[in-house]
């Protein structure tokens, strides 16, 4: 019985170390959201790293509202990519914990 608990503790520590490493990797990863003229880059914490707007001389002030909408779409696109990658990379740890309970 004692060996099983020790093995479980070792496995839990190993899983915790792997989880922490994966979380650190995700935080360092950049995700780019794109919407027509807008590119937004977020890190794994969903902090905005950069915003790039591609406009030319024909851009008019009336287009500002549309540009704001495109920024929002690009941000949401990048945020979805962060969530999907986190789910993909961290989901396996949640599945492993379910077997221990």
Locate predicted features.
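Stable alpha-helical structural segments in soluble proteins, enriched in small hydrophobic residues
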Residues: 70, 74-85
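Short acidic, glycine/proline-rich loop/turn micro-motifs
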Residues: 53-54, 64
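Long amphipathic alpha-helical segments used for membrane anchoring, targeting, substrate engagement
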Residues: 1-30, 81-101
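N-terminal intrinsically disordered, cationic/polar leader segments
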Residues: 28-52, 59
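Residue-level signature of catalytic and energy-coupling elements of molecular machines
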Residues: 12, 46, 71
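A short, polar/charged loop-to-alpha-helix boundary motif
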Residues: 59-68
């Amino acid at each position: 019985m004692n060996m099983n608990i020790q093995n479980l503790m070792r496995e839990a520590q190993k899983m915790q170390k792997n989880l922490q490493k994966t979380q650190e990797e995700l935080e360092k990863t950049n995700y780019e959201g794109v919407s027509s003229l807008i590119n937004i880059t977020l890190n794994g914490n969903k902090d905005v790293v950069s915003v790039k707007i591609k406009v030319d001389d024909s851009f008019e002030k009336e287009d500002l509202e549309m540009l704001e909408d495109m920024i929002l779409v690009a941000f949401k696109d990048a945020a979805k990519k962060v969530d999907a990658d986190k789910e993909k990379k961290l989901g396996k740890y949640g599945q492993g914990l379910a077997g221990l309970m």
